[in-house]
Amino acid sequence: MDLPCQDWVCHVEQKWAELRSEETERFSLLTDIDAIFNYGLSLICPEDLNILSRISEKFSVKKSPETASEFRQQGNLSFKVKDYPAAVLHYSKGVCHADKNTDELSLCYANRSAALFYQGLYQACLEDIRRSLEAGYPSHLQDKLQTRQTACQNQLRKAEKPNIPHTDHQLSPCQKTVNSTGHLSDGVSVYFSSDKGRHMLVMENKPAGEVVLEDEAYCSVLIPANIFNTGTNKAVETFGTEDRHCHHCLSQSLSFVPCPKCSYARYCGESCQKDAWDQWHQWECPVGADLLAIGVLGHLALRVVLKAGQTEVQMGIKNTKDHVTTYKNDSPVQLSLGGDCGKSLDHTDCFHGSSYMGIYSLLPHVAQHSPASRFLMAITMAVIYGKLQGGPPPNKWMSFKDEGVKASWQPEMSMLGATALRHMMQLRCNAQAITAVRVKEESGMAVQSSSEIRIATAIFPVLSLLNHSCSPNTSISFTTGFQPDPHNQLGCSEGHFDHPKGSRSGVTVTVRASKDLTAGQEILHCYGPHRSRMEVKERQRLLLEQYFFQCVCQACQRDLSEGSPNAKEHTAPGMKCVKCGKPLQSHTDGYTCSWSSCGHQISSADVQNRLQGFQLLLDEAVHLMEQDRLNEALHILQSAFSQANSILTETHPFQGELADALARLYASTGEWSLAASHLKRSLVAIQAQFGEDSIELGRQLFKLAQLHFNGRDGVASLSVIPRARRLLSLHCSPRCEELQELSEMEHCLQGLL
């Protein structure tokens, strides 16, 4: 939920509508962010704070012993049927809802330790045993914990012997060491020009797959999935991102440590818990429900300001006010890290690397936001600022720290709210979705589906400098948690900072060339609308609406020229004539057979209706598969396959989805050869849609290698692995799970053949 909840939006819209015309006009003319914030501050009253409090009741983050007990009991039910992963998730939610140092907390920890033990996670089990005892686990039950503790220690001692693997080989992400990030590779430089702003060029040839940039998120905020269930204070069955990922470093974990004050925030270990508390959570915690109500962007904007502190913000304000715009050169100028920043009023012609100034200097696009949108953001931040004043000011924002003097909110601290408003405006164009591949767990199928989902929203100071293309020459991947980087892939140059661990976010983006880049070429990133997934008009509409620019990338120019009134009819990709099977030509009103002797025509509406019908059949079949009703699903998929073949060629995206679903179904029944044959058919459609060097094709080849491996066809699996590895290596870290599994399969098969 990036934006505020609808109830709060409606309240602010009503407040906007009630303004007198002269007030509306006065606000609409304001372009200075401080003035916009102060105007919003002047309009709020205690009732606004009360209304937000009432709205946020449905997002309650209060501890609840009753809810903790419910989750523990649900965990017990999962434990009894040996569904240990689900048991751990239930126990973790119980841990988060239980009060500090209570029997309920100790019981949740103890039960979770048992579920972790049966998954072979012995180190994590020992940690939970320690936590349970520290929370006051009943003395008459401690024999069970001591027995489990001894068993864990024995297993870990066995694993220390050579050639004896064990499953608990990883440290908590919090315990891992970190290399500095936020740097460009050798041969990459930041430039500025009046038409492109800041952008990046490669100064030497870069082959596809080479890392060109690594950047660390300044801050990130998880996107909650179960936000509307939190207010019921009742245990719910499903688990969202907030239940699976550390709220500081975003790493996946099973054994979370909770915030001692609220039921929402949880961390992969005590280190992340402390770092988050020190940097922002001790001030976010009392207004946690309000932050869930105002949405991820408002929450992230506040978090950036809390982390930066008054000194950093004042430095940003002073530097921008001390300079006037003198930059008039139209030719690109190379920028050096921390170089002369006196050329522009807003520092948009400077390169600040990974520092806070890298965030502060991003354009807020004040004039491009509609007056109503500016009003919503201003009132929202003014009310949150008012809520924060219910507690002590953040340490980094206190005007004085004289011993014996009680800290209080000073008038000049309003810059906290104004700067948060600045960042909220910036995030409209500069927020970056953090994605992860998640396996769907609700299904009882032997073979489960996976999909890429958004788990968080972050802001990256260096990544934000990349310009957009609908057909980019880079791909990005994310790393979460504080992990070592033994590969040291980058020859570090500009933008290299050494941060103490406590100030780091643990969330890193790696940008790789997805195509061969030649010296002087601009590094381009896709903001979301991609040519392979969206028509040009829709892409341009979305980019103008959210990012305030008319895209003129090469892909858009090519697509627009093909669709111009002067352009000739062109072949409709993936479409064929229902009468003769020849390719269809698309035109303004519909489609015509390309074979002159046939000339059959079909309207666009008819085509859309057919495609929607195919999609409904596929959705129904997938639903049946998830219920393990495989025969019914197969009947529907075969019907959809027959109907689709009458009008769609093998390269149409729907044919790829259909073939993938059939492959999953046959894999569920152990018919590996049939599954592989259908998955091969999906490769044609995926390559046509995404390209022969795409990550999508690489992942599909990875699945094909798995099917051949499971079907004991080692020769076929070994023939697929090299191509899958090459494509995945273009887009992913060498440590990604897919590449590691490919190596394990290859090693196993080579030992057998």
Swiss-Prot record:
One of its GO terms (cellular component) is cytoplasm. It holds the Pfam family zf-MYND. It is found in: Nucleus; Cytoplasm. Zn(2+) 1 binds at C246, C249, C268, C272. It is an enzyme of class 2 (transferase). Gene3D superfamilies: 6.10.140.2220, SET domain (2.170.270.10), Tetratricopeptide repeat domain (1.25.40.10). GO terms for biological process: determination of heart left/right asymmetry; heart development; heart looping; heart morphogenesis; methylation. S-adenosyl-L-methionine binds at R112, S113, A114, N467, H468, Y527. One of its GO terms (molecular function) is histone deacetylase activity. The gene is smyd4. Residues 186-528 form the SET domain. A zinc finger (MYND-type) spans 246-285. Belongs to the class V-like SAM-binding methyltransferase superfamily. It catalyses: L-lysyl-[protein] + S-adenosyl-L-methionine = N(6)-methyl-L-lysyl-[protein] + S-adenosyl-L-homocysteine + H(+). Disruption phenotype: Mutants generated by CRISPR-Cas9-mediated gene editing exhibit severe cardiac malformations, including defects in left-right patterning and looping and hypoplastic ventricles. Its EC number is 2.1.1.-. Keywords: Cytoplasm, Metal-binding, Methyltransferase, Nucleus, S-adenosyl-L-methionine, Transferase, Zinc, Zinc-finger. Protein-lysine N-methyltransferase. Monomethylates PRMT5, modulating its transcriptional activity. May also act as a histone methyltransferase. Plays a critical role in cardiac development. Acts as a key epigenetic regulator of gene expression during cardiac development via its dual activities as a methyltransferase and negative regulator of HDAC1. This is Protein-lysine N-methyltransferase SMYD4. Zn(2+) 2 binds at C259, C262, H281, C285. Transmembrane segments: none annotated.
